[in-house]
């Protein structure tokens, strides 16, 4: 199953703020984690539209594990490499330990998508799904 990924983070190279995955069939997963010392741009453009209270990284990882376990195999699709980096980091739970996932592949596409709420990971992941599926004629 293709899962369309988007993340919001605290500036270029900054820590994760939110992550969303939208499956080809429309199923969605979205979590927000605490952001310590958010950059001014993030305070103005990301924090106000998160739409969800933050949870701990542990809670997010458990939620991610349970959601990913529903799929036989996973192909992550993102439009920005840093989204993939944050996703991979979220799979690591402690030194030498990670979330168990179904077989997993990834790709980064260059595609224009029009989010209904830019800088909200869930809306951006939905827009990425729509753009890719529209391009494929689905």
Tell me the role of every PLM-derived stretch.
Residues 3, 8-82:
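Conserved non-catalytic scaffold segment of RNase H-like nuclease domains
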Residues 22-23, 92-95, 137:
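Short, surface-exposed basic-aromatic patches at helix termini and helix-loop junctions that form
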Residues 66, 86-89, 130, 134:
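Residue-level signal for well-ordered alpha-helical scaffold segments within enzymatic catalytic domains
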Residues 80, 111-138:
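Acidic, Mg2+-coordinating catalytic module of metal-dependent nucleases/exonucleases
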Residues 84-101:
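Substrate-recognition/cap helix-loop segment adjacent to the acidic, metal-dependent catalytic center
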Residues 97-116:
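Short, flexible loop segments at boundaries between secondary-structure elements
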């Amino acid at each position: 199953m293709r899962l369309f990924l988007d993340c919001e983070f605290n500036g270029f190279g900054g820590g994760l703020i939110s992550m969303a995955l939208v499956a080809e069939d429309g199923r969605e997963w979205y979590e927000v984690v605490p952001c310590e010392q958010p950059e001014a741009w993030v305070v103005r453009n990301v924090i106000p539209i998160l739409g969800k209270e933050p949870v701990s990284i542990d809670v997010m990882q458990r939620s991610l594990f349970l959601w990913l376990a529903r799929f036989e195999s996973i192909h992550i699709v993102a439009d920005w490499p840093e989204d993939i980096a944050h996703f991979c980091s979220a799979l690591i739970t402690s030194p030498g330990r990670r979330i168990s996932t179904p077989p997993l592949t990834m790709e980064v596409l260059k595609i224009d998508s029009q989010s209904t709420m830019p800088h909200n990971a869930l809306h951006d992941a939905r827009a990425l799904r729509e753009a890719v599926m529209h391009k494929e004629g689905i």
